[in-house]
Amino acid sequence: MPPLIPGELIPEPGTLELNSNRPTLTLRVANSGDRPIQVGSHFHFFETNTALHFDRDAARGHRLDIPAGTAIRFEPGDERDVRLVALAGHRKVFGFNGLVNGPLD
């Protein structure tokens, strides 16, 4: 048996379905800036860089629907559809760009 690595996750064989049965939405996002913008998997999408243009009201309380620890990079002039998933748990958001700093609901 190989040595254990602290924090390592060993999933059961088969396919993992992330965020199953969670509310999602798809938004068209455009980078109007002159620099690339990278958004991480657990960043409150509503509070991303203002050079990203999309329906911010719809994005409130959502994050990217991508695996934890990954990110999406938007190059200048880039426009694409992204899938967002609703935040779960207590649905309180603190930090990021300080636009919420409290409960979402």
Swiss-Prot record:
Q: InterPro entries in the record, alphabetically?
A: Urease_beta-like (IPR002019), Urease_betasu_sf (IPR036461), Urease_subunit (IPR050069)
Q: Which pathway does UniProt place it in?
A: Nitrogen metabolism; urea degradation; CO(2) and NH(3) from urea (urease route): step 1/1
The listed locations are:
Cytoplasm
Q: Which UniProt keywords apply?
A: Cytoplasm, Hydrolase
Q: EC?
A: 3.5.1.5
The primary site where this protein sits is cytoplasm
Its recorded reaction(s) are: urea + 2 H2O + H(+) = hydrogencarbonate + 2 NH4(+)
Which top EC class is given? hydrolase
Listed under GO cellular component are: urease complex
Report the record's Gene Ontology biological process terms: urea catabolic process
GO function terms (MF aspect): urease activity
Please report which protein family the annotation says this sequence is part of.
Belongs to the urease beta subunit family.
* PANTHER family named in the record: UREASE
- Whom does it interact with, and what assembly results? Heterotrimer of UreA (gamma), UreB (beta) and UreC (alpha) subunits. Three heterotrimers associate to form the active enzyme.
Query: What protein is this chain from?
Result: Urease subunit beta
Lineage, top ranks = Bacteria, Bacillati, Cyanobacteriota, Cyanophyceae, Synechococcales
Name of the gene this protein is made from: ureB
